[in-house]
Amino acid sequence: DALTAADQMVLFRNGVRQALRRAGYHASFVCRPPFEGAVASGWHLHHSLVHADDGRNAMGPEAGAGAATAAEGMEAGSARHWLGDAGAHWLAGLLVHAHGMAALCAPSVNAYGRYRGSVMAPQSAQWGRDNRGALLRVVGSGRDLRIENRLGEPLANPYLAIASQIWAGLDGMARRLEPPPATDAPDGAGAALLPATLAEALDALAAS
């Protein structure tokens, strides 16, 4: 569950800091360390929705011949090819609120260099299936179907980061938002770029 995941993140970081301090090092969890040859690191959060009564995956189309036929008739770039109502609305909510969520999921000035010029990091609020340049990825199938959010950085407050993403997904469900088609472009061309600075992210959060 989300709260346990946040608790474990705090315990992990505290444990790493203490172990490295004893060895004479400092663990900062900074996204882009200022060392030659260093690469940026992110904190990817995987979202799963399940039915409370029996634990079935709630992301995909509902079971049944009609649902299977509808999914097969969808274009591969359509979210409905992979996701049912709950999953599609959740995905759309994460996209709509991505710019404001950045302030809580990437709360350091350092983090915003990661959103530029790298095919392995997101640059704009788009989703894809097998696209490691997209902000959101729909991964897995069947009971393992889930949404990967690649917005965050490792030093984010996990309680705020996770809560903001849950709120965004629930808002997408409440308003029955629909996501745009998937993208295969690694540079995220054609969609609004993610905030370039923490100040931009804070402005987006205030307007969200």
Which residue ranges define each predicted feature?
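Active-site acidic/histidine clusters and adjacent loop/turn architecture
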Residues: 1-11
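Catalytic-core signal marking the mid-to-C-terminal active-site face
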Residues: 11-21, 25-27, 50-57, 63-208
